[in-house]
């Protein structure tokens, strides 16, 4: 958490500042990856009001420095919705100095300082987890996670990687999102199970409804079969009773009374 010496009234507000670093994203994938993570997170944190996930939004850490706009970042311990409405930028002195605990950078064909200047800046700010996703890599891991330890970034190995301070894991998996069949980033729980996407949740609920309908139909069929079986048994009993009665009548005609035997 950063502290500012200047009185807050003297510092510019979000309305006074540009919404981003004014540098356009140079890959559609950058936004799609972050969008998917945010959409999944909305389901994981449903009902919570103490988190915010920004995408390509300007993060202002000093009134004397330009904003930096990560492809995605997560802050826990801030209001999900500001009283004045939607955030146009993330201004640290308006967020009680809460630094994003998680920052994501997606590498495109042209490097933008993900391994140098940005990494150093996030380290100096105190961002706990710095995640670099480099899908164009072939020989090295496409997902790198760094954890801040004694003011230095230390790589964390694994897939997924659990981040206990924020209660989430980050990892990668093959998936078809918006008709794009490829590797995507996902959130994971502590057991290493991947959280479902909104589309998967809808499909799962649909399957549950269909299974419930099938079970109800099967129960109805079993009940109907039981009724039919009971009816057949009763008919057989009735027929047996008629046969027994006819047999008894025939014996009486022959002078034989079964009751006297």
Predicted regions and their residues:
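Acidic-basic catalytic patches of nuclease active cores, encompassing PD-(D/E)XK
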Residues: 27-55, 61-69, 73
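C-terminal interaction segment
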Residues: 2-22, 43, 57-64, 70, ...
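Short acidic/polar active-site loop segments enriched in Thr and Asp
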Residues: 128
